[in-house]
A protein has these predicted regions:
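Mature catalytic domains of secreted/periplasmic carbohydrate-active enzymes
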Residues: 1-239
Length: 239
């Protein structure tokens, strides 16, 4: 089966004040690692930094460091100290935040997953009650794309995050559970925000590498989650 977390208050986050980011990063550095990609938010929506966009974070939902903790800042400080490049993993799919999906002001869904083949198997998302997609977006009470973009700005626009305030890569995991609500992602908007802070547009030497950003992707997945890749991994291209 599938399990990506739930919407209950975070009661399993038992990180103590003994968390030692410095030893973690130092050990990785000594082992030969050149970059540390930090999962700042996974599919469950819990944020390991002090986010202004939600209370479902390390400062609002846990007692870590008296409710004033910021794990991403701790790791960033250590990466800066040991000059370890950083990548940011920020899951687009979010099962916790109410802005995910399309709902009106009363919380009623504006999109439904329907059976268009009359075979008893739902196969397509479509607007309810004959609405157009444009009307769905107009009636959507909360804009998830803005929520996600605001969190990108919170992190990428704050010099306390990253190695010396900089991230080399942003990882957008494309996973989405079978029961996930329908949500279109504004990759263009997110791409512009990322490069504004971490790319050539932000006076960096190179553009930030992106994974899982559809047409804007620059980092290819090796095809498994086992950590193994062939010595030569070719990517097809239509010439």
């Amino acid at each position: 089966g599938e399990h990506y977390g739930d919407k209950t208050p975070n009661e399993i986050f038992k990180l103590t004040e003994d968390f030692d980011a410095d030893t973690l990063v130092k050990t990785l550095k000594e082992a030969g690692f050149k970059k540390l990609i930090v999962t700042a938010k996974h599919h469950d929506g819990f944020c390991i930094w002090a986010s202004e966009a939600t209370q479902y974070d390390v400062s609002g939902a846990t007692n870590y460091q008296g409710g004033k903790g910021d794990v991403l800042a701790d790791i960033s400080k250590a990466c800066t100290e040991h000059d370890m490049d950083m990548g940011l993993y920020l899951s687009p799919w979010d099962i916790h935040d109410e802005s995910y999906g399309y709902k009106d002001a009363s919380g009623k869904a504006l999109v439904e997953f329907v059976d268009t083949n009359n075979d008893g198997k739902p196969d397509k998302n479509q607007p309810v009650n004959g609405l157009t997609w444009e009307q769905v977006k107009q009636q959507d009470a909360k804009d998830y794309n803005k929520y996600y973009n605001d969190q990108l700005i919170e992190i990428l626009g704050n010099d306390k995050y990253g190695n010396k305030g900089h991230f080399k890569e942003v990882w957008m995991d494309g996973a989405k559970g079978s029961g996930a609500g329908y949500q279109e992602y504004d990759f263009k908007k997110w791409f512009d925000t990322i490069q504004q802070y971490e790319g050539i547009a932000g006076n960096q030497v190179d553009d930030c590498m992106l994974f899982g950003a559809e047409a804007y992707t620059t980092v290819r997945w090796i095809g498994n989650e086992n950590g193994f890749a062939a010595e030569e991994t070719w990517s097809k291209s239509n010439v």
